Amino acid sequence: ELNPSLVISLSXGL
């Protein structure tokens, strides 16, 4: 499972 914080950091990166 991926942590919400990681998803936010990646999304943000994009």
Curated annotation (Swiss-Prot):
Compartments where located: Plastid, Chloroplast thylakoid membrane
Record has Signal as a keyword: no
Membrane topology category: Multi-pass membrane protein
GO cellular component entries: chloroplast thylakoid membrane; photosystem I
UniProt family annotation: Belongs to the PsaG/PsaK family.
Annotated organism of origin: Cucumis sativus
Lineage, highest ranks first: Eukaryota, Viridiplantae, Streptophyta, Embryophyta, Tracheophyta
Annotated function: Not yet known.
A GO biological-process term: photosynthesis
Keywords assigned by UniProt, alphabetized: Chloroplast, Membrane, Photosynthesis, Photosystem I, Plastid, Thylakoid, Transmembrane
Protein's name according to its UniProt entry: Photosystem I reaction center subunit V
Keyword Ligase: no
